[in-house]
Design a protein with these regions (language model features):
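A short beta-strand motif characteristic of beta-propeller blades
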Residues: 198-203, 242-252, 285-291, 321-327, ...
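Eukaryotic protein-protein interaction scaffolds centered on beta-propeller repeats
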Residues: 13-211, 216-217, 227-228, 238-244, ...
């Protein structure tokens, strides 16, 4: 029992041992596993610890770096603040400097503008001084030119032709080159004397020369008719010592009182106050065409025939006879053909126009007053009208009166035009010569410009413009009324007939006479002559 018990005990012990052994082994294994786990965990913990330590070190390093960066950032912030403050101060300083610069620039601009204005004022004053000097010099030369013209005539009377010629040319030269009027009477007359610019002839019977007509295609030839029934062909011929006018009497009949003459198709038509109309050739052969009763005064070329104008009627002439007549509604004072229209002026101041078919239409008068002389220039399309008080009016193609040309002191009775030169005759025993290119129009425009303008505005000349001298016409006074004026075929000379029976051929071109005179000059004025006649205010110059 005891053995059994011992056995049992041993068994139990063995079992217990086995059980404890097994349990211990299990626990050991578990412990070992735990230990392994713990070792692994320890290793991991060590690693973690090391990593943590490293991370902590890194963190400390990063913290140190962060602290350093923060410190630097703070330093940068402080520096930035300082820089911002400095920049603000510099900006303020720059703004103040800019304001000062702007202020200085404004001052400089004002000073520059003031300097420019002062310069402009100086330039204006200089220009004004120059202009004043130019005006003074111009006026001085114009005045001197007039004095030289008078001196020229005096020297010619004193039989000093060379000096007289030089003074006449100098007079024209100073006027021509200083916008003066080279048609100043004394200058023009001194040129005429120097160039034999006027020729004279006395009608054979001494009748009043009522009309003149140039001979087409013949220089220096015209036909003159008088109230004594004379019809003479006048010709300029060269002679010893110059030129003279010779005459060929084509007709003389004291019963005729010729009032007009016209040359057409190589025939001469001479119109008597009470008729007839005499038709002549250049040999003196003639036929007489009887006219209806009237006081006849003008011949007007119309188509292939003529219009014979009486004071109260019009008659048409063609193919050697009168083909028709018409009574007028009033008394004619003047008549002229203008671009296919016949202009009729009446003694009551009325005006009418007649077309090619003979229809007469009353129109508004072109101007106030009674028109007593009319001439139409086809080249310029200028209608020239002279009136009872002696005034002459140029009218352009638009029926606009361009200017008032105060001329004769009595009735203007005849007008002609050669290029820009207008010549008028009147009952004041004077013939006037105007150069329209020299005429100072109120509008400020030239004659050529005025001709093309339907309307004009008054224009004020610029301050820098030396004024053109007002044109005063050349006046030639005769011993009788200047009844007839007619341009010569040369386009420069004009025939003038007077009530005393004289006929003159006058060169109406100052420039042409000046050129002739220049060509004949033999020398220049000496220094002493220059000082004597011209003076010291105008520098010496030569003309030869």
């Amino acid at each position: 029992m005891g053995l059994i018990a011992l056995a049992v005990v041993a068994g139990v012990a063995a079992l217990a041992y086995r059980m404890g052994y097994n349990r211990s082994r299990t626990e050991l294994a578990s412990l070992r596993e735990e230990m392994e786990q713990m070792e692994a965990a320890g290793k991991d913990a060590a690693i973690v610890k090391r990593v943590s330590q490293q991370m902590e070190d890194i963190a400390y390093q990063q913290k140190a770096i962060s602290d350093q960066q923060r410190d630097r950032a703070e330093e940068q912030s402080i520096l930035a603040t300082q820089n911002a403050y400095r920049a603000e101060m510099e900006s303020r300083a720059a703004h103040e400097a800019e304001l000062k610069a702007q202020s200085a620039a404004q001052v400089a601009e004002r000073e520059r503008a003031n300097a420019e204005r002062q310069q402009e004022i100086a330039v204006e004053q200089r220009d004004e001084a120059t202009h004043a000097k130019n005006v003074a010099d111009t006026l001085n030369r114009r005045t001197q030119a007039r004095s030289l013209a008078v001196s020229s005539q005096v020297r010619r009377e004193a039989d000093e032709p060379e000096v007289a010629d030089l003074l006449a040319y100098a007079s024209w030269y100073f006027l021509k080159n200083n916008r003066g009027n080279q048609y100043y009477s004394e200058t023009f007359k001194s040129l005429t004397q120097a160039t034999d610019g006027i020729l004279r002839y006395k009608m054979k019977e001494g009748g009043a020369v009522n009309a003149l007509a140039k001979v087409p295609g013949r220089l220096g030839q015209c036909v003159a008719v008088s109230n004594f029934g004379e019809v003479e062909r006048l010709t300029v011929n060269a002679s010893q010592g110059g030129k003279r006018i010779s005459s060929n009497a084509l007709l003389f009949n004291s019963l005729f009182d010729f009032r007009d003459v016209l040359i057409k198709d190589n025939s001469i038509y001479a119109l008597s106050l009470k008729g007839p109309l005499c038709v002549l050739d250049f040999e003196g052969n003639h036929v007489e065409v009887q006219l209806p009763e009237d006081n006849y005064f003008k011949l007007v070329p119309i188509g292939d025939g003529l219009l014979v104008a009486g004071r109260k009627s019009l008659s048409w002439y063609s193919d050697g006879k009168i083909t028709g007549s018409e009574e007028l509604p009033g008394t004619l004072s003047a008549i002229v053909e203008r671009e296919g229209v016949t202009c009729l002026f009446f003694t009551d101041g009325g005006y009418a126009e007649m077309d090619v078919a003979g229809r007469i239409v009353e129109k508004a008068p072109l101007l106030k007053g009674v028109v007593t002389a009319a001439y139409y220039d086809k080249a310029s399309k200028c209608l020239l009208l002279g009136v009872e008080d002696g005034t002459v009016y140029p009218v352009n193609q638009y029926d606009r009166v361009m200017e008032t040309m105060a001329a004769h002191k009595a009735k203007c009775v005849d007008i002609t035009m050669l290029g820009p030169v207008v010549v008028t005759g009147g009952y004041d025993k004077t013939a006037y010569i105007w150069n329209m290119d020299n005429l100072l129009f109120e509008s400020g425009l030239s004659f050529r410009e005025e001709l093309q303008k339907e309307k004009v505005e008054k224009r004020v000349s610029g301050s820098q413009e030396v004024p053109t001298e007002w044109l005063v016409p050349v006046d030639y006074t005769f011993d009788g009324w200047a009844l007839a004026v007619c341009g010569d075929e040369d386009g420069k000379s004009v025939w003038i007939g007077t009530s005393s029976g004289n006929v003159m051929l006058l060169n109406a071109s100052a420039d042409d006479m000046a050129q002739q005179l220049h060509n004949k000059l033999k020398r220049n004025l000496t220094q002493q002559e220059w000082i004597r006649y011209v003076g010291v205010s105008i520098p010496y110059m030569t003309f030869k």
